[in-house]
Every structure is written in C-alpha cells, then in structure tokens.
Amino acid sequence: VLGRCMQRHRNGEFIRFLNTVEAAVPAGKTVHAILNNYAAHKHPKVRAWLARHPRWTFHFTPTSASWLNAVEGFFSALSRRRLRRGTFTGIVDLQAAIKRYIAAHNQRARPFQWTKPADAILSALKRLPAPSV
C-alpha cells in the first residue's frame, strides 16, 4: 500500500499522489486506478496529467458502489484495527499511527486477487438498477 496523509484532498494533492504511484510502478507496466467520482479526480489538471501518462487508465466507480473500490476494504480495516477507539494527541500523532499501520500491513501484504474475471464484474455492473433521484 502506498499511502500519503495530506491536510487537504484537492487536485494538486491528488496529482502529487499519482506521481508517487508513477515513480513506484516499474516502467512498462500498465496502471489501472479505480476511483470514486470525487471532483478532484476529474479536474482539468488531473485530466492533463492523465493525457501525459498513457500507461494509466482511470476507472470511475458508480455512485453508491464503494464495494467495487478495493481500497475501501483497506480503509475499513485501518479504521477498525487502528483508529477506532484510538487516542491521538493531534494530527501529527494520528498521521504517524496511520503510517505505522501501513508499514505493518505492508510487511504481510499479498497482491489483491479479483475472484471473478473483469468481464463478469463489468457484466454484473450493467445489471445494477439505475440510481433513484
């Protein structure tokens, strides 16, 4: 897990995170980013960054489909195992706890394996009912 703690979550911070991932992924590998529909992910500066990095593909999850985003499971575990009922003296202490959790997680991490082929997942998405307004 590559993690960054940032005070804000705007397009600039997102681009800095993308650059971190870009530097960490070996050359020649394609990168598929699964994202929610947060405005910062679709900002013109982010789109320009994406245009300059052809090995990247963004996939946006449908609204109310956070279960498709594998990082949500990581956030849930982080919350349950480290943050809930935790006591932190401030933001720096909280960020240090998060960084320690990520480091410990990475000591035992294994690659995420989808249990279904991409075609089956995409087909299931098409069967979801349209969101009601």
PLM region spans:
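Short functional hotspots at interaction and active-site rims
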Residues: 1-133
